[in-house]
Amino acid sequence: MVWIWLGVGLLGGTGLASLVLAISLFTQRRGRKRSDETSSRGRLPAAASDKRGACACCYRNPKEDVVEPLDLELGLMRVATHPPTPQVPRCTSLYIGEDGLPIDKPEFPPARFEIPDVSTPGTPTSIDRSPSHCSSLSSLSSSTSVDTVLHQPPPSWKPPPPPGRKKRPPTPPVRAPTTRLSSHRPPTPIPAPRKNLSTPPTKKTPPPTKPKPVGWTPPVTPRPFPKTPTPQKPPRNPRLPRTVGLENLSKVGLSCPCPRPRTPTEPTTLPIVSVSELAPPPRWSDIEELLEQAVQSVMKDAESMQMT
């Protein structure tokens, strides 16, 4: 509208500009009067009337004498924070029914942000709902109960748990001990290598032995018993000393003088020598001396054994 006035003023038509201004002022006043009439009749805006089953809050503006709808939380805050004085607007709870008109219910909503048990209709709250504040709305209220209009509680409302009962944590299941024997052996830890030191030799595990038969028994090894010392026995046949004649006989047989060289045609002939000529037989006196020496040696050995 302002742009229209400026355009008309620039064109120079002052009479036309004044006419347009008068028409605009008349239409604004007429629209304001119509809004006051509809609000005084208790009709809420289309946005609030479309919400069937919702709760609203309204108050009368003392300056313009208009009933204005407010949010539920804002109205409760006004009641909780401000005392009911004529200067402060008071809240009146409204319930929008099936026909789109507000229904005054004294039991809903309660004061102090508490939602009552709507299954039992009932208890009036501390909110002041005197008909002096909203006389036009109280005339439109019906006599229907809460159970017929409000079928279910608000979606965010949950009943409080009973006092003194707490949830017990579930007990873990008890496992029975296993009876199976596990053949799993933990691996042997490998020692860390040390610096400037030779690693110790690792023990080699022997190869697995073959299983022995069932009826096999190890061989019985005889136990070594201590031996008792036995006395030294004298020889039964004493050895006779070698005679000089036998030694000479062996030397003669090995070193035989050969005056002529051997020829393959002539056979080798050795001179025949008798034993009696080379070594005479031993005498009896020599044999007796040997026997006496042997007897004396045996007697000495026997005496030494007895002394020990």
UniProtKB/Swiss-Prot annotation:
Keyword Signal: yes
Compartments, as annotated in UniProt: Host cell membrane; Host Golgi apparatus
Main location group: host cell
Domain of life: Viruses
Disordered as annotated region, ranges: 103-274
Comp. bias regions, Low complexity: 132-145
UniProt keyword terms in alphabetical order: Host cell membrane, Host Golgi apparatus, Host membrane, Host-virus interaction, Membrane, Modulation of host NK-cell activity by virus, Signal, Viral immunoevasion
Pro residues bias spans: 152-163, 219-238
Signal peptide: 1-22
Gene Ontology BP, a term: symbiont-mediated perturbation of host natural killer cell mediated immune response
One GO location term (cellular component): host cell plasma membrane
Subunit (UniProt): Interacts with host components of the WAVE2 complex ABI1, NAP1 and WAVE2. Also interacts with host ABI2 and TLN1.
Family assignment from sequence similarity: Belongs to the HCMV UL135 family.
Physiological role: Remodels the host actin cytoskeleton in order to impair immune recognition of infected cells. Mechanistically, interacts with members of the host WAVE2 complex and redirects the complex to the plasma membrane. In turn, the efficiency of immune synapse formation is greatly reduced.
Protein name, UniProt field: Protein UL135
